[in-house]
Amino acid sequence: MKKESKGTKYKQRTISVWNEVAPFYHKRWAKNEVGPFGVTKKLLELSKIKKSDTVLDLACGTGLVTKKLIRKVGSKGQIYAIDSSESALKIAKKWTGDAKNLHFIRADAEKVQFETKFDAITCQYALFFFPNEQKVLKNMKKLLKKDGTITLAVHGKYNVPYFDCILESVKKFIPDYLPKYPEMDRFGTKETFADAIKKAGFKKIVVKKFVFKYSPGTFSDYWNNYKKHLSKPLKEKFDSLTKFQKVNLREMIKDKTLEYTKKNGKIVFPWEVLVLTAKN
């Protein structure tokens, strides 16, 4: 029997997690474009997608970018939206409506093929999930028309305390809390982001930085919501901590949030996002 590769196992685990968390992700984040999801408008502006364009929304998730593309390309354009999570696609199909020029497909971004060529490809908050991003990027190149455009968004590496306050603390108690492969922040600077795209053969690469604000409420809101919506693999690791460890962890995280806590007790985090455009 052929042994599964590290990348294959990671992809299977990621699909399983997204099938579990997609409903919460959509309700809490994507649906209302809160915090970093304010970047969707910027991404579409920078993409310069026009009426009648044929566009691929790669790793479309629950359909935030996809839904806005319907108006962007108009009735004469075509939109193809792919994702590997059945749960996310189910939400996207229901939320975006039944436009005749919109096509949802469950597919692997590394391998998906189309008879048509695309004027543009969008990919918001997904590139870092791919264990072999070069396979995905090179497949994008094959799918694009000559001089077609890609527009990608990723979280910044250094100014996203929403994640760091919790994760850096948790890893002190559970060193293997998150998988080391792939590194989720590996495109989090302008240089590393541009280098990865250049390596895949794209040209005219431009990276812009945006900083949004997000409030998870009070510290109790932030902490309790995090615990409530952990995926099954992370919950199992978290639950392995003793009561004493959990108390210490909570205090450690609370200390990290103090610089972002306002007088009314609400936390307001900055959230850095990078948006890249490039030509085929």
Where are the regions that the model predicts?
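A short acidic, Gly/Pro-enriched loop at the edge of an enzyme's catalytic core
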Residues: 110-121
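Class I SAM-dependent methyltransferase SAM/SAH-binding core
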Residues: 54-112, 135
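Conserved Class I S-adenosyl-L-methionine
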Residues: 3, 7-10, 28, 33-37, ...
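Conserved catalytic/acceptor-binding region of the Class I
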Residues: 134-135, 149-217, 263
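Class I S-adenosylmethionine-dependent transferase superfamily signal
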Residues: 69, 140, 278
